[in-house]
Amino acid sequence: MPTSIELSPEMMRAIIMDHYSSPRNKRQPEGEGFVSTHSASVNCIDNIDVFLKMGDDGKVAEAYWDGVACAISTASTDIVCDLLVGKTEAEALYLLEQFTHMLHGEEYDPEPLDEALAFQNTYRQPNRIHCATIGWDALGELLKEHHHD
């Protein structure tokens, strides 16, 4: 049984629709020092680029995304960009891991997930899991690549 924090269906919808209709992190980054990757879905319209910049302190300084995506992918990717800023690489990877556990209906730590808890019932709709994880997975790859640089 998944661990969860109680959010009403209305609250979950409101969080998702807020980030879909007014994404805060959807833009091309300005300045230097960003790494990026492209991710697309064969089953949905999702076709995005994600951008990550690590600070000198080893924490995520900035995270953005740009492109075309469905409501689930847009909201989820926008939320993860918010959540990653200020996290160390280890904290960020832990966050990504907990989100993945949650989406697959496994035990997870809800503490770091914040607004991403709006996706806690996604495991009941397996066809939407990829939409919810496309941005998270891409940012996770960038974090892992940064670690090996």
Positions of PLM-derived features:
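Alpha-helical support elements that line or immediately flank enzyme active sites
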Residues: 76-88
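C-terminal binding/interaction regions
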Residues: 1-26, 30, 36, 87-149
